[in-house]
């Protein structure tokens, strides 16, 4: 079936649902590998990607592994001292702000790149992320995004660089660019089919499932990565309905209260369900 692009019309269920949140910014982008159908709503709004930027880090880790520049079984020292891109001054990550605490008790020890990558994705470990970014190089992460032809996505720094944040020097992405990235992984076009399958397996282990997967039917697998910082809440992934090709989906939100994240999760879960019903019936 030929590809067709559908921009959400005013009377569709998705647009109607989003209109219930006039004081929030809600973006959605979908690509259905079965039909080539695309669904967009505010998909080009640029936002802070929060921890969804960990997917590009994972892609560069696997690219360098494929190129023989590193081994996934290589062990990296665990430390908590990093340098701001603003002036090189040192900063440390706050354990309280990290959704994975396990590595902080292991400072001075080591862990494999494979396990650090898993913790970065399934538990959204900030410390694992910064360790991996120092190993592969932040500039290489961003360069690989560009080499893949993914527009409107930039990774320029690691996590919790507060000096950079105060100067608005941040990573950025849109729902459209994130869906483009997840589509390429689903299609096996990032590095190799084997590498994509391995990255999908990592994302299938995601431990935070309050958004895209929450209201989908039983038996539907979702390989995804969540993101949250301040009042940005996102989820990007690949949804695998039974007995058909998957679809790539990215949901970005801004403006939900930081102290009640359930509002954002519930909104994204509803949107995911609406899109699933539209595509699958």
Regions inferred by a protein language model and the residue ranges of each:
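Mid-domain, small-residue-enriched loop/turn segments at the edges of structured enzyme/sensor domains
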Residues: 25, 109-113, 127-182, 187
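Soluble non-cytosolic domains of exported or imported proteins
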Residues: 8, 47-56, 107-115, 122-123, ...
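Acidic helix-start/capping segments at beta-turn-to-alpha-helix junctions
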Residues: 72-92, 136-137
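Beta-lactamase-like hydrolase cores
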Residues: 4-48
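Extracytoplasmic
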Residues: 23-26, 42-44, 52, 71-73, ...
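Conserved catalytic neighborhood of penicillin-recognizing serine enzymes
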Residues: 83-130
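Structured C-terminal helix/loop/strand segments within mature extracytoplasmic catalytic/sensor domains
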Residues: 10-23, 37-38, 135, 179-210, ...
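Active-site SXXK
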Residues: 36, 49-81, 120, 249
């Amino acid at each position: 079936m030929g590809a067709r692009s559908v921009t959400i019309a005013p009377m569709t269920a998705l647009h109607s649902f989003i209109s219930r949140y006039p004081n929030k910014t809600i973006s959605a982008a979908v690509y259905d590998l079965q039909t080539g159908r695309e669904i967009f709503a505010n998909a080009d709004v640029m936002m802070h990607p929060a921890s969804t930027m960990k997917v590009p880090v994972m892609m560069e880790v696997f690219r360098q592994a494929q190129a023989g520049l590193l081994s996934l079984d290589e062990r990296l020292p665990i430390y908590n001292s990093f340098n701001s891109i603003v002036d090189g001054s040192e900063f440390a990550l706050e354990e309280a702000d990290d959704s994975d605490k396990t590595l902080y008790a292991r400072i001075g020890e080591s862990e494999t790149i494979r396990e650090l990558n898993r913790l970065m994705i399934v538990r959204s470990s900030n410390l694992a992320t910064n360790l991996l970014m120092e190993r592969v190089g932040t500039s290489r992460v961003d360069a690989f995004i560009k080499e893949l032809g993914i527009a409107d996505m930039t990774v320029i720094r690691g996590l919790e660089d507060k000096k950079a944040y105060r100067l608005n020097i941040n990573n950025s992405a849109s729902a459209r660019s994130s869906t483009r990235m997840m589509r390429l992984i689903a299609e096996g076009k990032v590095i190799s089919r084997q590498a994509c399958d391995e990255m999908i397996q990592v994302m299938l282990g995601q431990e935070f499932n309050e958004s895209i997967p929450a209201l989908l039917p039983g038996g539907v697998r979702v390989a995804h990565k969540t993101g949250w910082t301040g009042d940005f809440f996102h989820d990007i992934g690949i949804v695998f309905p039974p007995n058909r090709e998957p679809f790539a989906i990215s949901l970005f939100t801004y403006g939900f209260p930081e102290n009640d994240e359930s509002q954002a999760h519930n909104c994204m879960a509803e949107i995911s369900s609406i899109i699933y019903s539209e595509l699958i019936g």
